[in-house]
From Swiss-Prot:
It is a multi-pass membrane protein. The lineage of its organism: Bacteria, Pseudomonadati, Pseudomonadota, Gammaproteobacteria, Enterobacterales. Coiled coil: none annotated. GO terms for molecular function: proton motive force dependent protein transmembrane transporter activity. The keyword Metal-binding does not apply. It comes from Escherichia coli O6:H1 (strain CFT073 / ATCC 700928 / UPEC). Residues 45-75, 137-156, 211 are periplasmic. Its main location: membrane. GO terms for biological process: intracellular protein transmembrane transport; protein transport by the Tat complex. The chain crosses the membrane at residues 24-44, 76-96, 116-136, 157-177, 193-210, 212-232. This is Sec-independent protein translocase protein TatC.
Length: 258
């Protein structure tokens, strides 16, 4: 391989390193700003469960280091989540030079809507799902059983739900993207509604903790988001593939002229 051939690769690697460093710095800066409030952040996240606990019940720590490390771990996760727009922007800045003009126009709204829907999904989990799920689980405890949740177990439980709802709320973006690329169409998706409904419950079973209540609370919004995605996808059907064909045709004609 000649020096000229390695130059573009080295340039890309330097650019990738720069973008990765920017992502890491953004996470560290946000973490350092929030770490002082680590216990307050954990209290905020645990509030939906604490409100549903019977009188006199509290959360417990079964590991010696849990009271220190669990809030710190949560704060780091929050830092990652809050850094998502910066991370997505760095990804966009890295791949943008390789995209066509019409693709670049789509990416910005795609990144904004993806971030927004992810945060909306997490907010839905916190304000709607958590109170209902924890109320249901606390009230179904057998008689004589005192509900005292371990703080580390609770963190794992809620982060799984946060991620499940955040990712599931990306369904409209995924559908619009698939239709834009010409892989599917709104008509095909409408025909598959029964399968999508069953699939939503299967995904709910896989992504949420093993209780029917959480699975249902994820599956129903997922199906509603599917319908929203189908509605908006009709404005983007096949546009990406058509543009690619036009670009290929233009490139072919330029080669012929040469």
């Amino acid at each position: 391989m000649s020096v000229e051939d390695t130059q573009p690769l080295i340039t890309h690697l330097i650019e990738l390193r720069k973008r990765l460093l920017n992502c890491i710095i953004s996470v560290i800066v946000i973490f350092l700003c929030l770490v002082y409030f680590a216990n307050d952040i954990y209290h905020l996240v645990s509030a939906p469960l604490i409100k549903q606990l019977p009188q006199g019940s509290t959360m417990i720590a079964t590991d010696v280091a849990s009271p220190f490390f669990t809030p710190i771990k949560l704060t780091f996760m929050v830092s990652l989540i809050l850094s998502a727009p910066v991370i997505l922007y760095q990804v966009w800045a890295f791949i943008a030079p390789a995209l066509y003009k019409h693709e670049r126009r789509l990416v910005v709204p795609l990144l904004v809507s993806s971030s927004l829907l992810f945060y909306i999904g997490m907010a839905f989990a916190y304000f709607v799902v958590f109170p209902l799920a924890f109320g249901f689980l606390a009230n179904t405890a057998p008689e004589g059983v005192q509900v005292s949740t371990d703080i580390a177990s609770y963190l794992s439980f809620v982060m799984a739900l946060f991620m499940a709802f955040g990712v599931s709320f990306e369904v409209p973006v995924a559908i619009v993207l698939l239709c834009w690329m010409g892989i599917t169409s709104p008509e095909d998706l409408r025909k598959k509604r029964p399968y999508v409904l069953v699939g939503a419950f299967v995904v709910g079973m896989l992504l949420t903790p093993p209780d029917v209540f959480s699975q249902t609370l994820l599956a129903i919004p997922m199906y509603c988001l599917f319908e929203i995605g189908v509605f908006f996808s009709r404005f983007y059907v096949g546009k990406g593939r058509n543009r690619e064909e036009e670009n290929d045709a233009e490139a072919e004609s330029e080669k012929t002229e040469e």
